[in-house]
C-alpha cells in the first residue's frame, strides 16, 4: 500500500482561522471483489492567538477528506494559555508510543520543532518554543501528544487558586 505524505499546506480563511494540512494517506480496504481505495487527511486549525484543534477526515477523494478534517478540527478547538508568544512552563505530552517535551523559549528563538509539531505551533500563533519528540514519529500520534501537552498548560492564576494563595505568592 503506497503512502502519500503531503507537504504541510497553510491556508487563512475568511473567518480568521489558520488551517494546515499535515498529511494525506492513501488507504485501502480489501473486500471480496478487490481493493477499495480511499484517502485519510490530518489537519490542524488555529486562530493565531492560542486556540487550536485537530481533525481527521476520510473519503474516496482527497479534497473531500481534507474538508471533513478541517470541519472536525474547527469543532475540536480549545484555548491554550500563552505568555508573550510562548508557553507558560515546560510540559510533557503523550499519545500512544509518541512522547513530546514542550518548553518555553526566549524571544528570538523561533519555533524549534519537527514536522507535525511545527504546524500546530504555527496555527496557534506561538513564536518561540522548543519541542522534542521521542518514540513513534507517526504524524497522528505526534499531533495528539502535542495537544495533550498543551492541554496540561496552567496559568499562575490556576496554580494559585489550587493552592489557595495569591498569584504574587506563587510568582515570588
From Swiss-Prot:
Q: What's the encoding gene here?
A: rpsE
Identify the keywords attached in UniProt to this record, alphabetized. Ribonucleoprotein, Ribosomal protein, RNA-binding, rRNA-binding
HAMAP family hit by this protein:
Ribosomal_uS5_B
What's a GO cellular component annotated to this UniProt protein? small ribosomal subunit
Name the record gives this protein: Small ribosomal subunit protein uS5
Is RNA-binding set as a keyword in this record? yes
* Segments forming domain S5 DRBM: 17-80
Instruction: Report the family membership.
Output: Belongs to the universal ribosomal protein uS5 family.
